[in-house]
């Protein structure tokens, strides 16, 4: 009888532990997309040297408040350099970045990263090929 009670108690404890799930933060990052429409560059493109472009991003909060937007550029596959680092807030942010392509042939990767209060980061990039 004692073995049966021990077995039954052990089974009940395991069932209770298996039934309890720890709630976890889904860590949903902010949403960000490139602005489309007349006058905006919203995807990879081939451009002439020293061309002036406008890249726009639309950012929406998911769970946590937005805190920062970083714009960086990487030339010819090298490491990136920060062009602009902005403090942002609110549930919806739209940002336009005027870009002047280099006067020499090569590639430019423009990288936009948004961070929320929990440290969730969303990154979008596009590549300009200067010819």
Residues covered by each model-derived region:
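First exposed extracellular module after export/assembly in secreted or surface-exposed proteins
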Residues: 28-131
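Bacterial Sec-dependent N-terminal signal peptides
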Residues: 2-5, 10-38
């Amino acid at each position: 009888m004692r073995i049966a009670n021990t077995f039954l108690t052990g089974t009940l404890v395991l069932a209770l532990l298996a039934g309890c799930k720890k709630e976890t933060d889904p860590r949903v990052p902010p949403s960000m997309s490139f602005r489309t429409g007349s006058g905006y560059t919203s995807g990879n493109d081939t451009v002439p040297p020293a061309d002036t472009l406008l890249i726009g991003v639309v950012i929406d909060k998911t769970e946590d408040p937005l805190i920062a937007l970083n714009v960086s550029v990487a030339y010819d596959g090298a490491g990136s350099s920060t062009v602009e680092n902005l403090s942002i807030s609110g549930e919806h942010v739209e940002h336009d970045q005027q870009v002047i392509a280099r006067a020499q042939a090569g590639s430019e990767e423009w990288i936009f990263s948004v961070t929320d209060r929990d440290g969730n980061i969303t990154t979008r990039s596009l590549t300009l090929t200067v010819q």
